[in-house]
């Protein structure tokens, strides 16, 4: 564009006005481009006459913005709503602008013109389709009355219908409640549009997609010809009416309009407000709030905690397995086993009641146990199943000494070869098995067990086998000589296999002598 300054146009000064000439050339090129755009728009249907009123009102705004912000290159760039027609200079009186004015006047003879000045005509003509109604975006339109809309229903073109679809008529009611703002009355709308341009642009950016789906929800006189939402009611509705209107909306539309801080796409049906939408795994387990109560948001499903009758929970229905545990009546148990189980169960119940009362002297029970000689012996044991609990009670040591004294006295009065504390059944060993190991050793010294008391070999002190013994004679008949080893060559064993005998009741863990083997085999050379 600055290359055009080198050329000498007809009627222009050669020096001193180069800057003014380049500026004028820019404006001329810009006017030609806008005129071409206007002709293409008229070929597709042109502007409707309804927008001229809003254009004439917004012209002072555009003139002020043009003075303040300087010139711009093209009018169809993305600007603020008040920056659309700022490219022309009002003080330009050069002769180069006259052809452009003649061209514009000849071009607009077939249109209805409401403005007298060239600036207003240029601003109205150069307004692109994307910025047609930016000044009223976020506010209610100036031509929203129902009689005006009814007059223009029939003669709307396709181009006009596309523009009206994009218009945001009003704030959503839930957002207006959030911001605690009320809509201005009808008389103040023009004044607000002149004085509050910054807020108007903010509302334009935030409410681009807010009313895209309102033609589906609102019924009756509020819809005039496709997507145009024209409200005949006043804005002084109560909060109750607003809540009733919001309950009619679909849940995804509620979520898409609830957050006003994120911008969405302006394509039809495309909502990208992800902050208020839900994922597939969290689909609306809150929307059903009736009296019966839904399970996980599914209507009509009554949960189990509401389905059960509370009277059924109070009934003591006997559990057969639990009853069989209590009574000992298992199907696989024999009759004596059941009786023994019931006897032990009743005895344990009696012991628990006695443990609560803890008297000074604990009663003893005498159980007949068959002894090794054939006589019956009365065995003394403590009936307390939790005998080890006495070690942790305050009088544990004195009570244990009394039990030890009773056992020792009974052992001295009885047979010395019998044990006074021998246990023959599983439940009595349970009572005595809780004593410590040192107590068991002291008790065995006081009341020796039947059988050998010390470890030794079987037949250690036995007499040698006589030669007239039957076994000895059999071996001699087979070729064995006394004093030699067994076998054909006499290299076998010469002494009988030694069997280790341990004290009674100590079990397999008793330490054996290191020099001998612990295997217990029948003694071949022991005398009968």
Swiss-Prot record:
Pfam families xrefs: G-patch (PF01585)
Function: Enhances the ATPase activity of DHX15 in vitro.
Entry's localization field: Nucleus speckle; Nucleus, Nucleolus
Record's compositionally biased regions (Polar residues): 514-528
UniProt main location, coarse: nucleus
Region Disordered: start-end pairs: 36-119, 232-282, 487-528
Subunit (UniProt): Interacts with DHX15.
Record domain G-patch: where: 467-513
Keywords: Nucleus, Phosphoprotein
A GO MF term: nucleic acid binding
Residue numbers of Phosphoserine PTMs: 115, 117, 146, 195
Distribution of this protein across tissues and organs: Testis.
Entry GO CC: nuclear speck; nucleolus; nucleus
Name of the protein in question: G patch domain-containing protein 2
Composition-biased stretches (Basic residues): 63-77
Annotated PROSITE patterns: G_PATCH
InterPro entries referenced in this protein's UniProt entry, alphabetically: G_patch_dom, Splicing_assoc_domain
Biased composition (Basic and acidic residues): 98-117, 239-252
Origin species: Homo sapiens
């Amino acid at each position: 564009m600055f290359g055009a300054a080198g050329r000498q146009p007809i009627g222009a000064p050669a020096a001193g006005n180069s800057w003014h000439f380049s500026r004028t050339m820019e404006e001329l090129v810009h006017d030609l481009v806008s005129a071409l755009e206007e002709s293409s728009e008229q070929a597709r249907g042109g502007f409707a006459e309804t927008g001229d009123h809003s254009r004439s009102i917004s012209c002072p705004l555009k003139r002020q913005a043009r003075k303040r912000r300087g010139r711009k290159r093209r009018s169809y760039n993305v600007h603020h709503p008040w920056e659309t027609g700022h490219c022309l200079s009002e003080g330009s009186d050069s002769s180069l602008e006259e052809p452009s004015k003649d061209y514009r006047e000849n071009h607009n003879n077939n249109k209805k013109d409401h403005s007298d000045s060239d600036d207003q005509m240029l601003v109205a003509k150069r307004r692109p389709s994307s910025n047609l109604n930016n000044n009223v975006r976020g506010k209610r339109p100036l031509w929203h009355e129902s009689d005006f809309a009814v007059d223009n229903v029939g003669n709307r073109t396709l181009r006009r219908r596309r523009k009206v679809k994009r218009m945001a008529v009003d704030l959503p009611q839930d957002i207006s409640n959030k911001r605690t703002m009320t809509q201005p009355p009808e008389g103040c709308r023009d004044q607000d549009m002149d004085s509050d341009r910054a807020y108007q642009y903010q509302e334009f950016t935030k409410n681009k997609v807010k009313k895209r789906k309102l033609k589906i929800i609102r019924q009756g006189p509020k819809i005039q010809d496709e997507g145009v939402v024209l409200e005949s009611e006043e804005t002084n509705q109560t909060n109750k009416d607003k809540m009733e209107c919001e309950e009619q909306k679909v849940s995804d539309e509620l979520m898409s309009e609830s957050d006003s801080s994120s911008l969405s796409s302006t394509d039809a049906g495309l909502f990208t407000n992800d902050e208020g939408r839900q994922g597939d795994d969290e689909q609306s387990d809150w929307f059903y709030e009736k009296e019966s109560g839904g399970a996980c948001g599914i209507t009509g499903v009554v949960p189990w905690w509401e389905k059960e009758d509370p009277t059924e929970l109070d009934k003591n229905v006997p559990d057969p397995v639990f009853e069989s545990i209590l009574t000992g009546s298992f199907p696989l148990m024999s009759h004596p086993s059941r009786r023994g189980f019931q006897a032990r169960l009743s005895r344990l119940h009696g012991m628990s009641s006695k443990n609560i009362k803890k008297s000074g002297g604990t009663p003893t029970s005498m159980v007949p146990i068959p002894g090794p000689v054939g006589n019956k012996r009365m065995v003394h044991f403590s009936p307390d199943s939790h005998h080890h609990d006495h070690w942790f009670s305050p009088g544990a040591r004195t009570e244990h000494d009394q039990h030890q004294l009773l056992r020792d006295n009974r052992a001295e009065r009885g047979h010395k070869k019998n044990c006074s504390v021998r246990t023959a059944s599983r439940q009595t060993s349970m009572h005595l098995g809780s004593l410590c190991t040192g107590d068991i050793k002291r008790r065995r010294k006081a009341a020796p067990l039947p059988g050998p008391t010390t470890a030794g070999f079987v037949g250690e002190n036995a007499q040698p086998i006589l030669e007239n013994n039957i076994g000895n004679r059999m071996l001699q008949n087979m070729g064995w000589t006394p004093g030699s080893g067994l076998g054909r060559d006499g290299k076998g064993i010469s002494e009988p296999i030694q069997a280790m005998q341990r004290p009674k009741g100590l079990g397999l863990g008793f330490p054996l002598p290191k020099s001998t083997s612990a295997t217990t085999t029948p003694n071949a050379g022991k005398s009968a």
